[in-house]
A protein has these predicted regions:
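Residue-level detector of alpha-helix initiation sites
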Residues: 40-44, 113, 233, 386
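Acidic, Mg2+-coordinating active-site environments of NTP-dependent enzymes
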Residues: 29-31, 103-105, 123-274, 299-300, ...
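ATP-dependent carboxylate-amine ligase catalytic core
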Residues: 23-27, 54-162, 233
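ATP-dependent carboxylate-amine ligase
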Residues: 1-18, 29, 54-55, 229, ...
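A conserved segment at the C-terminal end of the G1
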Residues: 36, 44-61
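Short, acidic/turn-prone active-site loops that include or flank metal/cofactor-
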Residues: 62-65, 135-138, 200-203, 359-366, ...
Length: 423
């Protein structure tokens, strides 16, 4: 049996082993836990919290799963190379539980709902003081189809909502939700923690350029030195209220905030083009957010480079057809689609809407087309899978900026090479 098949079959059994020892270290640490969950946007929220709370907290960067969070508590890194590392981790966990302890007052932890029972597994252990439920959508939908087939839920959306609800249910003090989400409102109706609905429509003004964003609320302006979607008004209002609750100073100037790779990063490109890099992932909820940002962005010549939406299972065709309307609403000068799903489903829908698109399965052909066509006055906005980060790397004005792109780890480099994409 391969390691991958073993992990899938015995996922939670093995995860319980690491959680057991992590709990020993966790009890010695005894932090105030702030949990961040949702279908998309978790990492951006984490980054904003780090900007405000600083060194008073430990942050679970690159760790959000049933394995990742216990590893993080124990001060261990997960699998980054040889599978033999599992043996070392199994041996190291008991010793780390005795000798390792974080000392920060707060633990800001990202919790994913990638598979059924994962959020539940972590929520019942960590029992956070505060939960921030950022979003709800059909990310990892394919993982929840069995739950629907087995009759546990009517549809995939209901199954995903139920999974995320485990976190608010196990929260002791405060739960922040989107006031516009009927799913979140219904899911948190009877929990014991205080529910704080955040109204994004209280935002007074939103101005976005390829290299900056300003959000205005009342007399306060929140400034970023990169483009951000309008949707993160939710994050801003949450962070401001949370800092007041924690009795910590709130800083509305986010110009020095370090953003995670592939989350609306800004780069200068060859010939002077502007590059907006949102290539980290692609769910319909994040696609909607980024394409809305593109529509509102102050830029003369907008090009969209869109990759496939993955992990959609039986919803794949429907989601990619919906994508066409979102793209058309931007009124882009050019559209480049990369991937079999966008080529099969999105391109024909765009044609019906009167939007021409260049569709290819090969990132190299997309790059070739872009390099031949740009004049230097364009703003290229990237969103989706299919190794768009490789295309961006080849378009950078400064090759050193490549280290700021997503998927720099060895495994990702090897996957790109298997596609013939050198780095």
């Amino acid at each position: 049996m391969s390691v991958a098949k073993f992990k899938k079959r015995f996922y939670f059994a093995v995860a319980k082993y690491f959680r057991h020892f992590a709990n020993i270290a966790f009890k010695k640490w005894h932090p105030r836990v702030i949990a961040v969950t949702g279908s998309a946007g978790k990492t951006t929220m984490m980054t904003m919290l780090e900007h405000e709370i600083g060194k008073k907290a430990h942050y679970s960067h690159d760790a959000n799963s049933a394995f990742g969070v216990p590893f993080d508590v124990l001060g261990l890194k997960g699998i980054r190379g040889s599978k033999i590392r599992w043996i070392w981790l199994l041996i190291a966990a008991p010793f780390k539980s005795i000798f390792h302890r974080h000392k920060e007052e707060f633990y800001v932890v990202e919790i994913d709902g990638e598979r059924p029972h994962e959020t539940e597994f972590l929520a019942e252990w960590l029992r956070p003081e505060i939960t921030i439920w950022v979003s709800i959508g059909l990310s990892h939908a394919v993982q929840f189809e069995k739950e629907v087939e087995n009759g546990k839920f009517k549809n995939v959306k209901e199954a995903i909502v139920a999974e995320f609800t485990n976190l608010p249910v196990n929260t002791s003090k405060r739960v922040y939700i989107d006031a516009d989400s009927k799913y979140m409102i219904e899911a948190t109706a009877n929990i014991t923690a205080e529910v704080i609905p955040i109204k994004k429509d209280e935002l007074k003004k939103y101005v976005v350029y390829p290299d900056s964003t300003d959000f205005t609320y009342g007399d306060t302006t929140f400034h970023f030195n990169h483009p951000e979607p309008k949707d993160i008004a939710f994050n801003l209002f949450v962070v401001r209220d949370l800092m007041k609750y924690l009795k910590l100073k709130f800083n509305p100037d986010f110009s020095d905030m370090k953003i995670a790779p592939g989350r609306s990063s800004y780069f200068k490109g060859k010939k002077g083009i502007n590059i907006v890099d949102s290539s980290y992932n692609a769910h319909m909820i994040s696609m909607t957010s980024v394409l809305d940002m593109a529509k509102r962005m102050h830029a003369e010549r907008k090009w969209l480079v869109i990759g496939d939406i993955v992990d959609q299972g039986s919803l794949e065709e429907e989601e990619h057809r919906k994508l066409a309307k979102l793209i058309a609403a931007v009124k882009p000068e050019k559209v480049i689609l990369v991937g079999k799903r966008t080529k099969k489903y999105t391109a024909p829908e765009l044609k019906k809407l009167g939007v021409s698109a260049v569709a290819t399965l090969d990132p190299r052909k997309a790059l070739e087309y872009i390099e031949k066509s740009i004049t230097g006055k364009e703003t290229l906005i990237f969103k989706g899978s299919q190794y768009l980060e490789w295309i961006i790397e080849k378009l950078l004005a400064d090759p050193k900026d490549a280290k700021k792109l997503c998927r720099r780890e060895k495994a990702a480099v090897m996957r790109r090479k298997s596609w013939g994409l050198d780095s």
